[in-house]
Amino acid sequence: MEKVIITGGAGFIGMNLALYLIKMGYIVSITDIKTPRCKKLIPFFRQIDLLEIDNLKDYFKEISPDYVIHLGARTDLDGETLLDYSANIDGVLNVIAAINSTSSVKKTIFASSRLVCKLGYKPLDENDYLPTTLYGESKVETEKIIKTSKINSDWCIIRPTSIWGPWFGIPYRTFFDAVRSGYYIHPLGVEVNKLFGFVGNSVFQIEKLLVAEGHKVHKKVFYLADYEPINVLQLAKKIRKSFGLSDFIFQLPLIILRIIALSGDIMKIFGLKNPPLTSFRLENLKTNMNFDMNNIIEVVGRDLPFTLDDALDETATWIKHDG
């Protein structure tokens, strides 16, 4: 049975991935600076800071993993300087050092982010970056470190897109809660289509990348998403129906939403961490979002385990009973 270390295993994707790999028969070890909310994962958990290199190396040597999935990172947008994201820069250097100190590792998957490019921007290639946030800049540094380092295993980079599902938090849990409660307001007359990813499909894709032949994934970058764009207004209607509600969605002209978003920006300046709408979120909301998924389809295949309706039902059930 093959052994996997998941850094950031107490995060949203990390917990779902750990549960999936355990179910698939892997020997899973997870590490994070925080304890997993999912109590089933406590026996598999070790609290380790990515910035504590000696502890990290000792942990890797103790486990002797066949695979490493590096999800650990600071992911919020609240940092004031790039130094605030040291977990994404020094942290990845330490993970690489830990991998290189452990001869057992056959393959490593490193998580980056779609925010290495601004929303709506289509990069020319995997080395074309255009971040607009400090978090995005930190993930550009993450990728550059990986691509220029000597790593004693096959490796690839994943860029999760808009991933949602059980155990999620800001921003997509906020979106679901707003839609469910009737507070979500869609821009009137604006059609927005985006690639989202249900986390059940995302962990399926990650495991397929993990076991793929090395030449198919080594030194490549893969976006993580479901394959068909979803109309955001129709998604909001489906979310309401998954909770047994009417599919009515309130809509307002874009100019009014801009005023509300500016109010949210001001609230954030004065210390409110999570206002309902900001200019950044509005820009995200109204921007079509598509990515080149051809390379991951070539490795994983086109068939994913969850349809949109299945995914919504599973997420609604989790929110009602556990979330």
Model-assigned labels for residue ranges:
Residues F291-G323:
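Amphipathic terminal alpha-helices
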Residues V4-M24:
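N-terminal Rossmann NAD(P)H-binding glycine-rich loop of SDR-like oxidoreductase domains
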Residues T132-C156:
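Active-site Tyr-X1-5-Lys
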Residues L93-L134, C156:
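Conserved Rossmann-fold NAD(P)-dependent oxidoreductase catalytic core, especially the SDR/UDP-sugar
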Residues V199, I260-D303:
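Conserved C-terminal active-site "lid" loop/helix of NAD(P)H-dependent oxidoreductases
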Residues F168-T174, L188-V211, K219-Y223:
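Substrate-positioning beta->alpha
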